[in-house]
Design a protein with these regions (language model features):
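Pre-Walker A (Motif I) flank of P-loop NTPase domains
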Residues: 8-13
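N-terminal phosphate/diphosphate-binding loop that engages ATP/GTP or pyrophosphate donors
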Residues: 32-110
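Conserved glycine(s) of the Walker
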Residues: 22
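Short, surface-exposed amphipathic charged segments that create phosphate/polyanion-binding patches used
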Residues: 96-103, 237-242, 293-302
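ATP-hydrolysis module of ASCE/P-loop NTPase motor domains
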Residues: 94-137
Length: 316
C-alpha cells in the first residue's frame, strides 16, 4: 500500500487508544509521514495535555489558535504540519460569534454557563468539539486532519455524544449539529479511526473491545491498528556465552529478551486473529524523550510498514 494513498483515503483520521500506548507519539509520526507524502496536515488535540508540540521541538503549549509545527518546502519536499487544541469553551465562543452573538459569547463562556448546559444535556461539550472538527473538514483547511482522541474509555463516549444528543433533542441547531457530526463519523471517505495498542495482553484485549464498540455503537470505519513499541527481533539469543565472567548475566539477558520477543509475537498474532484489520508495526524507542529526530524515525517505520500492506480496503 502506498503511504500517500493510506493517508489520502479519508479526510479525518482519529487516532484512538488506551492511555500509555503512545497514541500522541503515533499521531506525530502519522502527521510526519503524511507531510512527507505531500499532504498538508492539521493535528487537532482535544485534551491539551499531550505534549504534542514538544515532539516537533516546540516549547510552548498548543492553544486554540492554529500554529505551524513543521513548515513545508524543505529538502524532502514535505508539506506543512499545523496544530491546534480544541476546547468546548473556545468552540462555543466561536460558534456564538458566527451566529451573531459576539457580544455575549465571552461573558457566557467565562460565567461557567457551558458547565450548566452540559449538566442538563450530557454530551454538549463533546459535540461542540466534534462540530468544530466537522467545520474544519468542510473548510478544506488541510488535506488531512488528524484528531488525537481522548484515551480509549472516553473516546467511545466522546464519539457517541452525537447519537445521545440526537435522541435527546428533537429540533433546533443542536440536533442539526449532532446529525452533521454523525454524517461525518459514518462516512468512510470523510472520517476513519486508527487504533493504537501495545503488543501486550491487556492492551490487545482493550483495543479489540474498543474496536467493536466503535463499529457497533458509533458506526465509524476503522483504518487499521498500530502496534507500537515492538522490540527488534534479535537472532542467536540461544548462543552459549561460554565461560566469560559475564556469562550468567548474558544468559539472563538473552532469556529475558527471548521471552519478550515470544510474548510480542504471540500478541501480534492474537490481535490479527481477533481483529482483521491492517496492522502497522512501530519499533520500541529506547529513550524517554521523543523529539523531531524520533518522530522522523517513527515516520519512516510507519511508511515502511504501510508499504508492506496490500492495497487498501475500507473496514466498516
Amino acid at each position: 500500500m502506498d503511504p500517500a494513498g493510506f493517508c489520502a483515503q479519508t479526510r479525518v483520521l482519529i487516532v484512538a487508544g488506551k492511555g500509555g500506548v503512545g497514541k500522541t507519539t503515533v499521531t506525530a509520526a502519522l502527521a510526519r509521514m503524511a507531510a512527507k507524502a505531500g499532504l498538508t496536515t492539521l493535528i487537532v488535540e482535544v485534551e491539551g495535555k499531550s505534549g504534542l508540540g514538544s515532539a516537533f521541538g516546540r516549547t510552548q503549549a498548543l492553544s486554540y489558535e492554529e500554529v505551524t509545527l513543521a513548515p513545508g518546502g524543505g529538502p524532502d519536499g514535505a508539506a506543512d504540519i499545523r496544530a491546534r487544541t480544541l476546547t468546548p469553551d473556545d468552540a462555543l465562543i466561536e460558534y456564538l460569534h458566527d451566529h451573531g452573538m459576539k457580544r455575549i459569547s465571552k461573558r457566557l463562556a467565562s460565567s461557567g454557563a457551558i458547565d450548566v448546559v452540559a449538566t442538563a444535556a450530557p454530551g454538549i461539550k463533546d459535540i461542540l468539539v466534534l462540530g468544530k472538527v466537522k467545520s474544519l473538514e468542510r473548510s478544506n483547511t488541510a488535506d488531512l486532519i488528524i484528531l488525537d482522541a481522548p484515551a480509549a474509555g472516553h473516546a467511545v463516549t466522546f464519539l457517541m455524544s452525537a447519537h445521545g444528543l440526537l435522541d435527546a433533542v428533537r429540533v433546533g441547531p443542536i440536533r442539526s449539529q449532532a446529525q452533521e457530526v454523525i454524517d461525518l463519523l459514518t462516512d468512510a471517505k470523510r472520517c476513519q479511526i486508527l487504533l493504537v495498542t501495545l503488543p501486550e495482553e491487556t492492551p490487545v484485549n482493550e483495543v479489540v473491545e474498543t474496536a467493536y464498540k466503535l463499529e457497533d455503537r458509533v458506526g465509524v470505519s476503522l483504518a487499521g491498528v498500530v502496534v507500537n513499541g515492538l522490540y527488534p527481533e534479535l537472532e542467536h539469543l540461544d548462543a552459549d556465552p561460554g565461560s566469560e565472567p559475564e556469562a550468567d548475566a548474558l544468559r539472563a539477558a538473552a532469556a529475558f529478551r527471548q521471552a519478550r520477543q515470544d510474548l510480542q509475537r504471540e500478541q501480534v498474532t492474537r490481535l490479527a486473529e481477533a481483529l482483521p484489520l491492517p496492522q502497522v508495526h512501530l519499533p520500541f524507542l529506547f529513550t524517554t524523550e521523543v523529539g523531531p529526530a524520533e518522530v522522523d524515525q517513527l515516520a519512516e517505520a510507519f511508511a515502511g510498514s504501510i508499504a508492506a500492506l496490500p492495497d487498501p480496503a475500507v473496514h466498516a
